[in-house]
C-alpha cells in the first residue's frame, strides 16, 4: 500500500476533509486521485461532485480504473474524455457496499487508528452489502462472460 492510501493515512481521505477540498473547487474544477476506494468516491459524490473513472493503464484488469476524477458541476466536462470515462455498472454498485462507508473525523483531531476503528464499527452496523459478496458476484459475471 502507498503511504498515502486511505488505509495508511485516513486523515487525508475523511468525508470532512474531502468535502472541504470539494468546496474549494471552482465550477468545472477537477480533483484527480489514484484512489478508486469506494469510501473516497462516495464521500466525493456526497460532497456534490460528479464522478468519472480514470482509464486503466495497460495491463490493468478490464472494468476497473486507474483512479477517480471528481468534477465540480458547472463546467464543461464531457462524460468521456482523453483519460476518463463514466463509471461502469460494477463501479456504481461498489458505492453501495460496506466499502463505501466513509472515513470520518468530524473534529479533525482523530488519529489514524481512531478513524480506522470507528469505520470498522460503522461498517459492521451499516446494513450495506458486504464487499466480498459484491466481489464474488462481479468475478462470477466476468467468468460467465469469458466463456
Regions flagged by a language model, labelled:
Residues 27-35:
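Conserved beta-strand signature within the Rossmann-like core of class I S-adenosyl-L-methionine
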Residues 11-27:
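A short glycine-rich, Lys/Arg-flanked "PGG" loop and its adjoining helix->strand segment in the class I
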Residues 11, 31, 59-75:
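Accessory recognition modules or surfaces
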Residues 68-147:
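SAM/dcSAM-binding transferase cores
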Residues 1-12:
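A short SAM/SAH-binding and catalytic strip from SAM-dependent methyltransferases
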Residues 3, 34-38:
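Short strand-turn motif at the edge of the Rossmann-like AdoMet-binding core
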Residues 19, 41-66:
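Conserved Class I S-adenosyl-L-methionine
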Amino acid at each position: 500500500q502507498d503511504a498515502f492510501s486511505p488505509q495508511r493515512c485516513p486523515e487525508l481521505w475523511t468525508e470532512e476533509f474531502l468535502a472541504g477540498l470539494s468546496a474549494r473547487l471552482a465550477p468545472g474544477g477537477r480533483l484527480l486521485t489514484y484512489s478508486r476506494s469506494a469510501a473516497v468516491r462516495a464521500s466525493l459524490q456526497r460532497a456534490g461532485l460528479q464522478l468519472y473513472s480514470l482509464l486503466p493503464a495497460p495491463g490493468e484488469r478490464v472494468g476497473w480504473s486507474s483512479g477517480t476524477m471528481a468534477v465540480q458541476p458547472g463546467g464543461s466536462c464531457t462524460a468521456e474524455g482523453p483519460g476518463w470515462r463514466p463509471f461502469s455498472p460494477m463501479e456504481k454498485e461498489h458505492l453501495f457496499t460496506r466499502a463505501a462507508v466513509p472515513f470520518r473525523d468530524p473534529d479533525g483531531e482523530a488519529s489514524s487508528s481512531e478513524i480506522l476503528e470507528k469505520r470498522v464499527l460503522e461498517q459492521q452496523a451499516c446494513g450495506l452489502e458486504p464487499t466480498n459478496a459484491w466481489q464474488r458476484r462481479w468475478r462470477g459475471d466476468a467468468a460467465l462472460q469469458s466463456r
